[in-house]
UniProtKB/Swiss-Prot annotation:
This is Estradiol 17-beta-dehydrogenase 8. Belongs to the short-chain dehydrogenases/reductases (SDR) family. PROSITE patterns: ADH_SHORT. Gene3D superfamilies: NAD(P)-binding Rossmann-like Domain. The gene is HSD17B8. NAD(+) binds at residues 51-55, 84-86. It comes from Callithrix jacchus. Substrate binds at residue 38. It catalyses: 17beta-estradiol + NAD(+) = estrone + NADH + H(+); 17beta-estradiol + NADP(+) = estrone + NADPH + H(+); testosterone + NAD(+) = androst-4-ene-3,17-dione + NADH + H(+). Heterotetramer with CBR4; contains two molecules of HSD17B8 and CBR4. Pathway: Steroid biosynthesis; estrogen biosynthesis; Lipid metabolism; fatty acid biosynthesis.
Amino acid sequence: DWDKVIAVNLKGTFLVTQAAGQALVSSGCSGSIINISSIVGKVGNMGQTNYAASKAGVIGLTQTAARELGRHGIRCNSVLPGFIATPMTQKVPQKVMNKITGMIPMGHLGDPEDVADVVAFLASEDSGYITGAS
């Protein structure tokens, strides 16, 4: 359902980004806002128009927030995972998974820990000059 996907993926991300940004600005603290998008938001995917549009919106939202909040020392980045081994991907038929993994340069799905490591890096001071990245 178009409206539900947009409400959860895009509006939900907007509301959390807005609240975090306002809280950080009003406290005078610097910080890092990290939004989760998807590679589908960048390259699209058959049968996922609503999902692709919502995740592309997250990318644009994050890049704009980075520009607006940077002067306050607040970094905003988005992570665009590809196909990750989750309960959702376990439901995909094996024939389809074979086709998907054949298109992945590494030849296999990523693990949730792969995404978590990127998020942890972006949240740390080690990424202190990275903002607006996807």
